[in-house]
Every structure is written in structure tokens, then in C-alpha cells.
């Protein structure tokens, strides 16, 4: 199993591969399975011709990487950005495979992207880019193949354009071709807040651990210094503020 030079800054894919190599060694993964899982199942590169509002024809590069379909259709977002790269998309697609597997969701991992600056594009230009990108990857996506979703600089509107374009080619409405679409088109309520809500759950659990640890520290401090717990809490807080202030002075 290959090793990665840790002296240089790793790309997104190299970082994923380095972590995968560590996990593979710990699991004693079969060499053949290791090779199969380390590389994506399919990489699609498209060149998207779009007529801009000025009448000028421009061409944008787009990608869709399907890392694994071993556990079901691949699943992953589509991102727009000037710094999008195939390497990044490749690494993020693999991470989607691991995320779905670790919580036992029957999907594989995928990711897509278009190199463009959405902040410099009009709504009409974004729509034309999205629809043409969808048409270019049409044969590789679908409810039973690969299901896109919003990601960086894409949203419900982007998914609505993808769904509409796919449905026009299918000659019937296909709601399940994307997730993250508007509720009016069959999207899930609460999807927009889902990531933030998940973060809230994690923070709540972590805060509970911190509060228990802090309470135990107060009790120990009170017992060791022969003071009541309220005084101990104040004294610990003062010590902590003094320590943080000193650290800022040292490292500022």
C-alpha cells in the first residue's frame, strides 16, 4: 500500500488517500479490495459551451466523479467555483462513500463541479451553465444511478434546473433525480437546516461533556482548597482567564 510524502501540503485527493491508507492498514484490507476502493469507479469530464448575456460564447469545464456504486446509487453534491478541480472532486466523492457507509446508508459516493465564478454570472447565465452541464452528464445520473445535491455555491434553484432538464429528456417528471430541491417540487422539509441542526447536536453533546468535566474540576478544587463550590468556580474561572491572557501575550 502506497505512502504519501507528508512534507508537502497534500491535495484534497491525496489527503483522502493518506487517511484511507491508514484505515486500510489497520483493517488489514485485502490488496485487491484496497486498489478497487482507492480509485473512483468513473470520472466524467465535460466542456460546456454557453452563450453569455453579451452574446459571446464561453466554455466551462465540468466534472462528475462517481467513486463507488457497490452499496447502491452514488450520491453527492455539485459545486460551482473558480477554484474547483478534478482532484478536489475526486477526493470529496470518496469521502461521500465513507460517510454513507459509516452510517449504513445504501448509497455510494459521488461529487460534481463546474469551474466558474457564480458571483460574476447572471441568473440566466447560471441557468444555462447548469442545464447544459446536466445534459452533458445525463446518461450517468438518475434515481438508480447517481443522485446530485446542492453543495458550494449551488442551491434549491440549481437542483430545480437539473431536475427540469433531466425530466424533459426523460419525457416525464423525475423528482428523485436530485435531492435538495424546493419543497414544492418534492423536496424534504428541513433539508436546508439539516447540516446546521446536525452541528447543533454535536455541540450539545460536547458541551454536556465539558460541563460535567468542569463541575468535577470545581468539586476537586473546592475539596483541595477548603472553599465552597461557588468560590471554587470563581477561582477556576479567574485562573483560566489569566492563563488565556498569558498565552495570547506569548503567541500574539
Question: What are the language-model segments listed below?
Answer:
Residues 81, 101-206:
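Glycine/serine-rich phosphate-binding loop and adjoining beta1-alpha1 elements at the start
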Residues 3-47:
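Short, Gly/Pro- and small/polar-rich lid/capping loops
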Residues 46-52, 58-67, 163-166:
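Short beta-strand elements
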Amino acid at each position: 500500500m502506497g505512502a504519501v510524502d507528508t512534507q508537502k501540503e497534500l491535495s484534497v485527493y491525496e489527503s483522502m488517500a493518506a487517511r484511507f491508507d491508514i484505515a486500510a492498514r489497520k483493517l488489514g484490507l485485502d490488496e485487491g479490495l484496497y486498489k478497487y476502493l482507492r480509485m473512483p469507479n468513473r470520472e466524467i469530464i465535460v466542456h460546456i459551451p454557453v452563450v453569455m448575456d453579451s452574446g459571446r460564447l464561453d466554455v466551462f469545464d465540468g466534472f462528475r466523479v462517481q467513486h463507488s456504486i457497490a452499496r447502491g446509487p452514488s450520491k453527492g453534491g455539485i459545486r460551482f467555483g473558480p477554484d474547483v478541480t478534478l482532484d478536489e472532486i475526486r477526493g470529496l466523492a470518496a469521502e461521500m462513500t465513507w460517510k454513507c457507509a459509516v452510517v449504513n446508508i445504501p448509497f455510494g459516493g459521488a461529487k460534481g463541479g463546474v469551474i466558474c465564478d457564480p458571483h460574476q454570472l447572471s441568473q440566466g447565465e447560471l441557468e444555462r451553465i447548469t442545464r447544459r452541464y446536466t445534459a452533458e452528464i445525463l446518461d450517468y445520473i438518475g434515481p438508480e444511478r447517481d443522485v446530485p445535491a446542492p453543495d458550494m455555491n449551488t442551491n434549491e434553484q440549481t437542483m430545480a434546473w437539473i431536475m427540469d432538464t433531466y425530466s424533459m429528456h426523460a419525457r416525464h417528471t423525475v423528482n428523485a433525480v436530485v435531492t435538495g430541491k424546493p419543497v414544492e417540487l418534492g423536496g424534504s422539509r428541513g433539508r436546508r437546516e439539516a447540516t446546521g441542526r446536525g452541528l447543533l447536536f454535536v455541540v450539545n453533546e460536547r458541551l454536556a461533556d465539558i460541563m460535567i468535566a468542569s463541575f468535577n474540576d470545581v468539586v476537586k478544587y473546592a475539596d483541595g482548597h477548603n472553599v465552597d463550590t461557588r468560590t471554587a468556580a470563581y477561582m477556576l474561572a479567574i485562573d483560566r482567564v489569566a492563563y488565556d491572557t498569558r498565552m495570547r501575550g506569548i503567541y500574539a
